[in-house]
């Protein structure tokens, strides 16, 4: 028995120390019995912060938020059985978003698998479709090989924590009773750092010269995931190229004349210019209309992504590069005789008129876009905006016009689950305001527990149209009118003031935009600001904006 305890202690303390060595500073633990050895190891490590969350689904998304806020890998730990399955949505989001989430599932020893033992399901390869790397660790014994397995596997897995290969990894760790390590053996807990991998690639610019010497080019920038963007702006300035900047690109914070923000509304309203080439940078953009245009244009498309598994959506490019945006555009710097001034000025002219129409519209609007416009005005440069999927991210895409604020969202799998938890995880490291709809909020209300337990301050702006507002813009609204409200509108009739009381948030309700204009977003007290809106009115007012922009494009071109 003594040998077992010593072997278990050495295994879990070494594992915790190796995670620290590769950059882990935070672990989110969902309590359970089988995870006792590792939970105690993390708790005993002097330089690892532990967070306790009883709901595994919410805990995993909270960790995703910690990663977004700290730009470091974060681990999650749970007990054996169905607890692990609750991690799946956040792992799927992490895989598509290239987020280094380290998934640690405790398991029954091998002799208790597939024999009907309690809390024992097949956990080996259970996230196979969503993780970049996975390994079923050996059971603790007193052999050197068991400890070597930790060193070897962590070294292999570390390539997925940084650089172009980032993504979630999964270690399944079986533990045999008794489960308590020797907490006095703290000399086994180390805080040494490993040399982290560095990735950089160059390109042969001459291979693209015949394309880039054409006149009508565009740079389209999606989610940059913390990459530097200064060379994009430099290249655009030198070579007179418009930049269509997604709100997650962080380029809209720059007051740069080449940054185009209104493109979604412009394409939605009929804009269709002939283009010779497109340089697509980063993740796919939010705008459905821009993605539809990319699918049908005959422009030569270049894709630049700093990861090994490129996201070709919405259409496979003609050529792609696995390289950082800054390295790519730095490699292209050369003399050129192409004069693009008139091409750039055409885009700048349309952008200027588009912004004017949007501002005029917002001065009179009373729909959700008016609330979103006011929120953007109220958000300071010190705050980050975390935007829920569905309608909120689309309104921000349309209405955020060059303001120095950082915008974040879960745009990997684009789900509405885990939004509150992700934003709260970010709020540990940044001042965050969350913009979210009522159904997304309902989906993750239990995530608010982390704010209550850990005094994490965050403001929540809740757009409440009592249902799924985005479905009003889809064909089923007209083709399935008899069933629309029940199947798609899905009203809940919930009073979220009770949610605020349950989790000790302040609560303020606004029935119109005028009331919200006079409100102040507090920075010291966590508050839910509920904005009451109407789905049908919201749809009708958006159509008015589209029509105004359509008329502007017709008159301008």
Curated annotation (Swiss-Prot):
Q: Name one GO molecular function term.
A: manganese ion binding
Q: Which InterPro entries match?
A: MenaQ_synth_MenD, MenD_middle, THDP-binding, Thiamin_PyroP_enz_TPP-bd_dom, TPP_enzyme_TPP-bd
Q: Which reaction does it catalyse?
A: isochorismate + 2-oxoglutarate + H(+) = 5-enolpyruvoyl-6-hydroxy-2-succinyl-cyclohex-3-ene-1-carboxylate + CO2
Q: What is its EC number?
A: 2.2.1.9
Any Pfam family:
TPP_enzyme_C
As for what it does, the entry says: Catalyzes the thiamine diphosphate-dependent decarboxylation of 2-oxoglutarate and the subsequent addition of the resulting succinic semialdehyde-thiamine pyrophosphate anion to isochorismate to yield 2-succinyl-5-enolpyruvyl-6-hydroxy-3-cyclohexene-1-carboxylate (SEPHCHC).
The name of this protein is 2-succinyl-5-enolpyruvyl-6-hydroxy-3-cyclohexene-1-carboxylate synthase
Q: Which organism is it from?
A: Staphylococcus aureus (strain MRSA252)
Source taxonomy: Bacteria, Bacillati, Bacillota, Bacilli, Bacillales
Q: Gene of origin? A: menD
